């Protein structure tokens, strides 16, 4: 049985993420979606919210497990007996960082492979950062996220600044 881990912050989980999960889950016996704590990134959604979103969107895949992790990816990979780390590459700009991470992971986990997957054409430009910015500015994100995620975004934006629906960090 081949287990793969697809780690990420998933802040929020987008249609691009789901596209990779759908495709990777057809390759591996088990795909573990690892939602990283990533406190140093100061995520828009809490870890618990990101887990809830991932369960909502990915819960129908029978061989996909969603769980959180803190600390080193290598420890999470080992604890799940994974043989592969799945990473998405949207553009050349992603490659340099992902290549360095794959090299470090190979050093730390010599028996684990990193598999890069490119998104389907319609999702190549989607990123959680861009989706959050559009949502915070009142734009339509329905083409980039699932309806439940769009609702989570609207509620979070409204909670941050109920007066105008924009981020509380904006003046």
From Swiss-Prot:
Site (described: Transition state stabilizer): 17
Protein keywords: ATP-binding, Coenzyme A biosynthesis, Cytoplasm, Magnesium, Nucleotide-binding, Nucleotidyltransferase, Transferase
Official protein name in the record: Phosphopantetheine adenylyltransferase
NCBIfam families, alphabetized: coaD_prev_kdtB, cyt_tran_rel
Family: Belongs to the bacterial CoaD family.
Catalytic activity, as annotated: (R)-4'-phosphopantetheine + ATP + H(+) = 3'-dephospho-CoA + diphosphate
Lineage: Bacteria, Pseudomonadati, Pseudomonadota, Betaproteobacteria, Burkholderiales
SS bonds (residue pairs): none
Species per Swiss-Prot/TrEMBL record: Paraburkholderia xenovorans (strain LB400)
Gene Ontology cellular component terms for the protein in this record: cytoplasm
Pathway: Cofactor biosynthesis; coenzyme A biosynthesis; CoA from (R)-pantothenate: step 4/5
Function per UniProt: Reversibly transfers an adenylyl group from ATP to 4'-phosphopantetheine, yielding dephospho-CoA (dPCoA) and pyrophosphate.
Residues annotated as binding ATP: 9-10, 17, 88-90, 98, 123-129
The enzyme's E.C. designation: 2.7.7.3
Amino acids binding substrate: 9, 41, 73, 87
GO molecular function: ATP binding; pantetheine-phosphate adenylyltransferase activity
Compartments, as annotated in UniProt: Cytoplasm
Highest taxon in the source lineage: Bacteria
Cofactor(s) of this protein: Mg(2+)
Gene3D superfamilies in UniProt: HUPs
HAMAP family named in the record: PPAT_bact (MF_00151)
Enzyme class label: transferase
Oligomeric and partner information: Homohexamer.
Record GO biological process: coenzyme A biosynthetic process
